[in-house]
């Protein structure tokens, strides 16, 4: 054995490298000892292994066999001596590493006890307990804030009891009692007497105990190879030495614990939060935070607040929808489309070459009626409202978040975030720190960093191009399938087909393309999730926060393009660059550009949003409910059955599903994408907030059900806010103003109708003596001479036209015979000017209101600021008085000693 005298680096190699020979590291409080791995285990006398104890038959016990020491963490491994395969002595090597790790845990002060599984003799459960001294030591290291004295400030609303009509929505306080609140301060062992310690067993709650133990487990070494340390429970689990590591749930979710001292918080959460009968109740956020930690608590607080705000948006959206629905009868332009004497007499030009027939305008009657619902004045009002709503939501959430920071004691979260082991493992370059002028190690030079950033950016850009390619593929599909559906129209324009009344070629194409687009989106999401993690790992961020933020931006950028690209195409590109029947625009030189319905592409955008948003919500909820439930069901069938066997708490939890390394990352991502649908394209679909509201009400309870019933308990983590998702939402809110203004201007037909009503229905352009919408359809569909088709030299595929020599198409162009035939007419330029003016005015109005609201509403309320300042003052005063009391006491003792010394020295002289 030899003493390690120099600092060694971390190593995060591939999992299979853990099977290589290296030196086992054993630690005690005075030194680190390195033991060669060769030789028999009998010769290794330095291992301090946990004692094996038999299960005491108490299924709800959270303690060691002695019933005194609480279980703070569970480690699970498969007994190496009972494994069937032992390739190249792998089992022996893994056993040495595990024993060295457990020995080092004991050297760090943790207490271990091992118990074999009651259902599978191969499995061994190692129970970990942190004694008082260890908890105090690491609480000081981790800057954990602990109670000083009960808080005399009221943090809850003083009007809460007056809201008797909302009592049914509140948490039952007789079941979930309000938590006692305290003034807190970072723990210091030297000031232990200042803290509110009534009972050592309850001073550190189970969540804090688990967090401290996990901090130790993540940093204890077990092997050194080539002067490189290997350590941490995460690496041991990933390499298969341990099968799992997790804190315990405190009881079964559907029954209270038999132990009367157990608070059964998991059962309370299931009953008052996750159970379907509690779907209408507010969330017990304080208990969620206490049981799962602040990071989980802040997610559910944010999701709940977002859902509450959606209620207002949903009500206004439904009102606008009903306005459009009830106003259908006053929709003049739709009546003209459906009128046999107007729409029935208008012959529309073919929308593709040769194969597509001429068609009557009135076959779009039903779609025009549906379009009246969404393309109404109420839509404009709703778009403006949503621009203000999203600002109110973000500003009030900041205030709510500040309140939670105060209530949950995370205002001054003191967490010195350590570098990720994966980062330190690559620190091979030595540089001089410009500030400290000391040597420090970094993973790569400036040139190497530039290369990595370039490669990562190129990879992300490549995948974005792949999405764009898939969108182009969908466009080609739409063009091809539209031709197929158009050929089903009767060649004789006077013919009829019952299905055409409800399903036009454009609508059929839109529905099928939306479904295919949704499937492609789901497939690309599945692939890119793995690719994004690989890219971020290669990028090598320094801290876990940096890692999550980098991954967040990559995933959101990809998801943004993936989910919204098809919507942007329909809203802003489809039907905008089509030319006219005599000179159409071709995509890729082959496919004729898509055209919109005579009423515009707004209804198609609504269809796209409904299918993608609704399909995504249904798919995610099915996946979140069914997948963990099925996996747990399969696991139960695989286990040895036997109703006579009593299963301990740790074994019950082991058979639950593990939570992913990224925790609630994908839950946040799902909600942010939904937030984008609700805000970016809401002008085309006022029912989007209602769908989001219904989905979120279910989402909260589904996530709660998963956490409490299907997943192991997560290690509690601290968090002040929702992290990088806040600026992402702010960016979406700014972009939403532009997209909704452009949807109303360029996708809907609201501006052309207003221009016709105010300018072209009366002289000098119109024939009416008063403002009216009569004649809108006839005056806004351009005329084309059938003889001007470019393929007139070929056999004419159209029959049954009778005396028709003209057809109509959607555009604002001069008629044949005009000096500037088929050029844009004066109406077109009036409409363009009106659209641009509308966008500028709407954006400036909404942005002005947004900035005023942001300025007028402070991020932290005055009451919360006062509470924070008063708590700081009282905490400092309390610590100062305590310190002064100790100082006075010590000075008194010193004075007495000095006085005694003086008396002894003076007394002989007096004699």
Curated annotation (Swiss-Prot):
Disulfide pattern: 331-372, 338-365, 349-807, 352-356, 596-601
Major localization listed first in the record, in broad terms: membrane
Disruption outcome: Mice are viable and fertile, and display no major morphological defects. They exhibit deficiencies in Ca(2+)-dependent phospholipid scramblase activity in platelets and defects in blood coagulation. They also show reduced skeleton size and skeletal deformities.
A Pfam entry, by short name: Anoctamin
Record key words, sorted: Calcium, Cell membrane, Chloride, Chloride channel, Disulfide bond, Glycoprotein, Ion channel, Ion transport, Lipid transport, Membrane, Metal-binding, Transmembrane, Transmembrane helix, Transport, Voltage-gated channel
Phenotype upon changing residue 612 to A: Increased speed of phospholipid scrambling. Constitutive scramblase activity at basal cytosolic calcium levels
Consequence recorded when altering residue 667 to Q: Requires much higher calcium levels for the activation of scramblase and ion channel activity
UniProt effect for mutating residue 370 to A: No effect on lipid scramblase activity
Effect of residue 615 to A: Requires lower calcium levels for activation of scramblase and ion channel activity
Protein's UniProt keywords contain Lyase: no
Topological domains annotated Extracellular: 323-376, 478-510, 574-602, 745-837
Consequence of changing residue 563 to W: Loss of lipid scramblase activity
Residues of this chain annotated as glycosylated in UniProt: 330, 362, 494, 778, 785, 803
Subunit structure of this chain's protein: Homodimer.
Name this polypeptide is given: Anoctamin-6
Species for this entry: Mus musculus
Gene (name only): Ano6
């Amino acid at each position: 054995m030899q003493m390690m005298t120099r600092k060694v680096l971390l190593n995060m190699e591939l999992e299979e490298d853990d099977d290589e020979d290296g030196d086992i590291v054993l630690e005690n409080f005075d030194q680190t000892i390195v033991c060669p791995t060769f030789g028999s285990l009998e010769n290794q006398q330095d291992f301090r292994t946990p004692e094996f104890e038999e299960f005491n038959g108490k299924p709800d016990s959270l303690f060691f066999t002695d019933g005194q020491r609480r279980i703070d963490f569970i480690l699970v491994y498969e007994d190496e001596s009972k494994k069937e395969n032992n390739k190249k002595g792998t089992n022996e090597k893994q056993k040495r590493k595990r024993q060295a790790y457990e020995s080092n845990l004991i050297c760090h002060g943790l207490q271990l006890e091992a118990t074999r599984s009651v259902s599978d003799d191969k499995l061994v459960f190692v129970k970990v307990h942190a004694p008082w001294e260890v908890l105090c030591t690491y609480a000081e290291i981790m800057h954990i804030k602990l109670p000083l004295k009960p808080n005399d400030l009221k943090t809850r609303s003083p009007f809460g009891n007056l809201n008797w009509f909302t009592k049914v929505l509140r948490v039952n306080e007789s079941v979930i009692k309000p938590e006692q609140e305290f003034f807190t301060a970072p723990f210091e062992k030297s000031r232990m007497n200042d803290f509110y310690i009534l009972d050592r067993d309850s001073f550190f709650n189970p969540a804090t105990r688990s967090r401290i133990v996990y901090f130790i487990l993540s940093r204890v070494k077990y092997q050194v190879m080539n002067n490189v340390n290997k350590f941490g429970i995460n690496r041991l689990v990933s390499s298969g030495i341990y099968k799992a590591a997790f804190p315990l749930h405190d009881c079964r979710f559907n029954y209270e614990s038999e132990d009367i001292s157990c608070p059964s918080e998991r059962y309370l959460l299931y009953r008052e939060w996750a159970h379907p009968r509690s779907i209408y109740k507010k969330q017990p956020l304080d208990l969620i935070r206490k049981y799962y930690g602040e990071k989980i608590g802040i997610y559910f607080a944010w999701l709940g607040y977002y859902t509450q705000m959606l209620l207002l948006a949903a009500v206004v959206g439904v009102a606008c929808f009903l306005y459009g629905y009830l106003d259908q009868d006053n929709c003049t332009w739709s009546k003209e489309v459906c009128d046999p004497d107007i729409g029935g007499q208008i012959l529309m030009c073919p929308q593709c070459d040769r194969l597509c027939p001429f068609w009557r305008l009135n076959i779009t009657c039903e779609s025009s009626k549906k379009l009246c619902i969404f393309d109404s004045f109420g839509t404009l009002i709703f778009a403006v409202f949503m621009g203000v709503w999203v600002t109110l939501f973000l500003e009030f959430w900041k205030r709510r978040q500040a309140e939670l920071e105060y209530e949950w004691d995370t205002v001054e979260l003191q967490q010195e975030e350590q570098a990720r082991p994966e980062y330190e493992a690559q620190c091979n370059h030595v540089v001089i720190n410009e500030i400290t002028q000391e040597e420090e190690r970094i993973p790569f030079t400036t040139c190497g960093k530039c290369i990595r950033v370039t490669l990562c950016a190129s990879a992300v850009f490549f995948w974005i191009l792949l999405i764009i390619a898939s969108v182009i593929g969908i466009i080609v599909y739409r063009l091809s399938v539209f031709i197929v559906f158009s050929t089903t129209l009767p060649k004789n324009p006077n013919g009829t087909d019952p299905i055409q009344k409800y399903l036009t070629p454009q609508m059929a194409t839109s529905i099928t393309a939306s479904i295919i687009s949704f499937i492609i989106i789901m497939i690309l999401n599945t692939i890119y999730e793995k690719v994004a993690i690989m890219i971020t790992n290669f990028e090598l961020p320094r801290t876990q926060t940096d890692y999550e933020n980098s991954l967040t931006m990559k995933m959101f950028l990809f998801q943004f393009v993936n989910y919204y690209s098809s919507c942007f195409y329909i809203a802003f590109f489809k039907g905008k660059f089509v030319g006219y029947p005599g000179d159409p625009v071709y995509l890729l030189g082959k496919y004729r550009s898509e055209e919109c319905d005579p009423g515009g592409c707004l209804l198609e955008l609504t269809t796209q949003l409904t299918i993608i948003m609704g399909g995504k919500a249904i798919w995610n909820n099915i996946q979140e409910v069914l997948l963990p439930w099925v996996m747990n069901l399969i696991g139960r069938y695989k286990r040895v059955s036997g109703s006579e066997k009593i299963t301990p708490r740790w074994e019950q939890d082991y058979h639950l599903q593990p939570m992913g390394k990224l925790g609630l990352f994908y839950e946040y991502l799902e909600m942010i994408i939904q937030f984008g649908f609700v805000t970016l394209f809401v002008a085309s679909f006022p029912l989007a907030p209602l769908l989001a509201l219904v989905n979120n009400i279910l989402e909260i309870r589904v996530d709660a059900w998963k956490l409490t019933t299907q997943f192991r308990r997560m290690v509690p983590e601290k968090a002040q806010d929702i992290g990088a998702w806040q600026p992402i939402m702010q960016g979406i809110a700014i972009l939403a103003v532009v997209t909704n203004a452009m949807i109303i201007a360029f996708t809907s037909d609201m501006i052309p109708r207003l221009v016709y009503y105010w300018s072209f229905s009366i002289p000098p352009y119109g024939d009416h003596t008063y403002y009216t919408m009569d004649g809108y359809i006839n005056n806004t569909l351009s005329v084309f001479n059938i003889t001007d088709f470019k393929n007139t030299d070929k056999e004419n595929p159209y029959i049954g036209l009778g005396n028709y020599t003209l057809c109509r198409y959607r555009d604002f162009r001069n008629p044949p015979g005009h000096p500037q035939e088929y050029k844009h007419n004066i109406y077109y330029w009036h409409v363009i000017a009106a659209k641009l003016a509308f966008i500028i005015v709407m954006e400036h109005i909404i942005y002005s209101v947004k900035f005023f609201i942001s300025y007028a509403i402070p991020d932290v309320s005055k009451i919360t600021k006062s509470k924070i300042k008063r708590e700081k003052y009282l905490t400092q005063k309390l610590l100062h008085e305590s310190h002064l009391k100790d100082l006075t006491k010590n000075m008194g003792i010193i004075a007495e000693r000095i006085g005694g010394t003086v008396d002894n020295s003076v007394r002989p002289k007096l004699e």
